[in-house]
Amino acid sequence: MPESPIRKLAPLAAAAKKKGVKVYHLNIGQPDLPTPQVGLDALKHIDRKILEYSPSAGYLSYRQKLTEYYKRFKINVTADDIIITAGGSEAVLFAFMSCLNPGDEIIIPEPAYANYMAFAISAGAKIRTIATTIEEGFSLPKVEKFEELINEHTRAILICNPNNPTGYLYTRREMNQIRDLVKKYDLYLFSDEVYREYIYTGSPYISACHLEGIEQNVILIDSVSKRYSECGIRIGALITKNAEVRAAVMKLCQARLSPPLLGQIVAEASLDAPEDYYRDVYEEYVERRKCLIDGLNRIPGVYSPIPMGAFYTVAKLPVDDSEKFCRWCLEEFDYEGETVMMAPAAGFYTTPGVGRDEVRIAYVLKKEDLERALIVLRKALEAYPGRVKVNE
């Protein structure tokens, strides 16, 4: 089971704080923006004498309300198509365990969310990665590259759209390319779409559920964690029109009894958040994105493409090893009593040696803190003993 590149340096950050150093957390996608007040009010006003099990598939009222939410994105599903899970992570794990046998293979563009590997190991499956590069903005390679990986063990393709960790948004051409592969080889398409609210380029959001001809192959993964700053209530969803897959998933849901009761109450109420809540959150991320990307690309030797969605970017640094650099920032460096914590990007790749000069950065801090973190990062790079000379 691999370590999490997002969390494995947390003890070093805790030790730095204990010494009085302020740590700017750029490593983890924990939004700092407020949870919708309607969700908090629902939690505050829970008036129950018993906190009972909920149905294993989740409350019907919540699933019905979700269908209206998805219609806003032209995703037409019924309450029966939706299974509520304990976060998007459980949805991914249950999808793998329901659709894959030990030894089956999943094709995933890399870099990819690191926990996918852990879930695949739990399901006895194997991940085959297809390379995307920072130089190409993390766009997908040609279809022939996918077909080179497809064999008798291949059962699925997984995408995250918009992407974590890169912020890349798949184009219509790329989504059609994936559809054609799924249809040609009769594969499952696992599509993690938890960042659909956060698209910044004017390009269309194309859900896997929009792709014609593969409706029975698509398993959509969703979560309220990033949409409503509700990571702690652990509510996600697995959505598919494939009744056989739903039946298999329900066996796992029944074995784990029920998704979180209180979390469902908060999540259902949060669907009534006013439009200005979504607008204000979106506009804040637009501003933060510009602040971060402009600031990164002004630092000598640093390069980041412009992320099109989500609230992450992968940046290339002029360092010998980004994990060593991230550790050094926490253990040996501070600038005026402050330092930065980032996620070494090698942990988002399975190909050995790739991503060693890259980091994932989450722009989940207010603009003033991002500006200060960029100053601290610049000073850290100037002082780091393992800095590499690049053409600047």
Predicted regions and their residues:
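Basic nucleic-acid-binding alpha-helical/helix-turn surface characteristic of O6-alkylguanine DNA
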Residues: 49
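Generic structural signal for well-ordered alpha-helical scaffold segments
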Residues: 14, 67, 71, 96-97
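PLP-dependent class I/II
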Residues: 2, 9, 16-24, 28-46, ...
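Conserved N-terminal alpha-helix of the aminotransferase class I/II PLP-enzyme fold
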Residues: 53-86
